[in-house]
Regions:
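Histidine-/acidic-rich catalytic cores in large beta-rich domains
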Residues: 1-331
């Protein structure tokens, strides 16, 4: 894991075992991050690793967050299962005990039954959940790359259920889940293959409204639904259907749970990245990583480019986030 300053100079490198560190969580002068697909550690300010959490019978992937009790919620794959990247677990922060909170097969059984294993694949990656966001203590917003859909889950600790989805009504109609979709308030091209969906409360909004922002990779592909014709889906325009050159976007949605609607309120075109990538709103600006393009940039909210960094080597820059390390390394 590499730490750069605002001038693009490497200031620190933190070694890990394997896989990747997806992002950093802070709590009580301890910094938490993954060091493999099996372990998350807590590192103190001196560099001493004081906490080690093992994911047990699961492998972590893509994202983890604190819940309202500072337990760690983790996107996971069960090690011996035939499917992958479709479960959510909780690691109790004090004990390290693991609880499976949600299995997407239980929530979307009809859709699951329509998917098929691609040629050469070892596991059925039928949802490919790639981000987590906590809402009102007991709800989660998750992102499914494989279905180009954003999903809100309620009652995650007791009896999980789907509150709504943001995606294509044509895509979901066959399996009968199209009634869960929010309605678009205007004609815009929906997110495709998105990453890093982030929940934002805003006290200026009426109750039941909030923002979601995300990296819209803008690649409409579903390897476990190979017969679906994304090109003829009227929910998409200027969207790409192969790994060739294109344009990706920062998207910001206004969600209104009262009217069950979603509105695109902001969009910034960025370097194309068919997979991976991240976006972060911070101090009035937007930090955007186009992972496959090996570049990351900072923009003002109106889309003015402030700075861009590029690097070489490796396959991609998985994610880029900006931290001030206040009260951790700096006062």
């Amino acid at each position: 894991m590499r730490l750069y300053d605002n001038y693009g100079i490497i200031r620190s490198e933190i070694p890990i075992v394997s896989y990747r560190s997806h992002h950093i969580l802070f709590e009580n002068n301890t910094m938490y991050f993954s060091i493999s697909n099996k372990k998350i550690v807590g590192m103190e300010q001196t560099g001493y690793v004081s906490k080690i959490y093992d994911t047990g019978n699961y492998k972590l992937h893509h994202d983890y967050i604190f819940d309202s009790n500072n337990n760690i919620l983790v996107l996971a794959s069960e090690k011996e299962a035939k499917t992958s990247e479709d479960k959510i677990i909780m690691i109790e922060k004090d004990s390290g005990n693991i609880t499976e909170l949600a299995d997407l097969i239980d929530l979307l059984p009809n859709y699951y039954s329509t998917t098929s294993l691609p040629d050469g694949a070892e596991n059925l990656d039928w949802m490919h959940i790639n981000s987590l966001a906590l809402v009102d203590k007991t709800s989660l917003i998750i992102s499914s790359r494989e279905t180009s859909t954003i999903i809100k889950l309620d009652n995650i600790y007791s009896n999980p259920s789907i509150d709504y989805m943001i995606g294509s009504d044509h895509f979901w109609k066959e399996s009968g889940y199209d009634s869960l979709l929010l309605n678009k308030t205007s004609d815009f091209s929906m997110q495709a293959g998105q990453h890093c969906v982030t929940y934002v409360e805003d006290n200026s909004l009426p109750q039941g409204q909030y923002y979601l922002y995300l990296y819209n990779n803008n690649l409409a592909v579903s390897t476990t639904q190979s017969d679906y014709d994304w090109k003829n889906d009227s929910n998409y325009s200027n969207t790409y259907y192969s790994l060739k050159k294109g344009t990706s976007y920062y998207y910001k949605y206004l969600v209104d749970e009262n009217t069950r609607t979603v509105e695109l309120v902001s969009s910034i075109p960025v370097a194309y990245s068919e997979y991976v990538s991240s976006v972060q709103e911070l101090d009035g600006n937007v930090i955007i990583d186009s992972g496959i393009a090996m570049s990351w940039s900072e923009y003002s909210q109106d889309g003015t480019l402030l700075k861009t960094f590029k690097t070489t080597g490796g396959k991609f820059v998985y994610r880029v986030f900006k931290y001030d390390y206040l009260y951790y390394w700096f006062q």
